[in-house]
Amino acid sequence: MVFSISRRAALRLAFGGLAAAADFRPRKLFARDTSGDGDKVRVGAIRWDAWYAPDMAPGSSEWHAAHGLDPAKYHHRAPFFAEKIGTDRMFISGTQASMDAEISYAAKAGISYWAFGWYQFGRPLRKGWEYYQLSEHNALVNWCALIGLGSLAGNFPPTADLVRYFQYENYEKFGDRPLLYVMHDKSPLPAAARALDALRAACAAAGVGNPYVIAQSSVAKLGALDARGIGADAIGAYASAPAMTGGPIPYATLDAFVRKFWLEMAATGLPVVPNAMTGWDRRPRIERPPPFDPLHLNPDDYVIPGTPKDIAAHIEAAVAFVRAHRGTCEANNVLVYSWNECDEGGSVLCPTWSENGVDHSRLDAVARVLKQAQLL
């Protein structure tokens, strides 16, 4: 695949040079022509960019995530641009070249867009998005924002910023409607509903398409309550997995659970954007709990990683579900967990580090099934 870089070459590239928040603008781009996509199901993947300069913020979420992969047994979960600097130490600090390579990998595999977990300017968690917008290749993979219910209610990002982002040529849309994922939290629904009403009004005033908002929850009925409570357009999930209290479970159990979850979401009567799960092995966070993570699981509570073929078949099933439920899955869309949740879920689509070079076996398997599925 093009733009592939060595780990050492990536480390030689200097970090920095991004514009300040007030002046930041994306590189001028030309949108990828999707007019010939026809009946193709759009496949997105979630990004959580803890891998771009985490050591700039010691003690932060991104710092904990990156150093959670320090033990040798977790090195294989690190993104491909990581550098092994000790038996139990990785240096992970993505660069513009890293992002260019990620875009190329994703585009060649048939990934339509990334859903970026949203963070404020100045956080390393925001650097991945900034590098993406500065890339000469960012028209190859679209993007959209993924925010929390409380963020929506708290006007973060500000309404004016969202309206501006929605006008980016590479912002993912359903027709002319920009996608916006809103993840469940315990925030009051009325405030979020008012904020969403204001966002829709601001979009209308600016001549921007009415946002297509997907309320995300790992419980179908709760997602439906959120969607109806704030006036969202559809439901989906950031991640969903069975309760684990008796030791590791096979990936096949996760696969079956998620397929059942799609039906549960459809049974609410609301439109659905089905999720797909590449894995749910949280052992790095279980063994070295970061302060931001509310889950307190036992070390044996994890999903045994699936093979590349297993993961590809699961994503293929999500695409097939959309095709078989066109009325319910009106946005013609699937969202995959995840592209790069390397410490939380593992088995990510983003190519990863290995002693023998870049491991893109999972992404290659997914590319093969997506190519075949989109030809049907």
What label would you give each PLM region?
Residues 33-376:
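Glycan-processing catalytic domains of CAZymes
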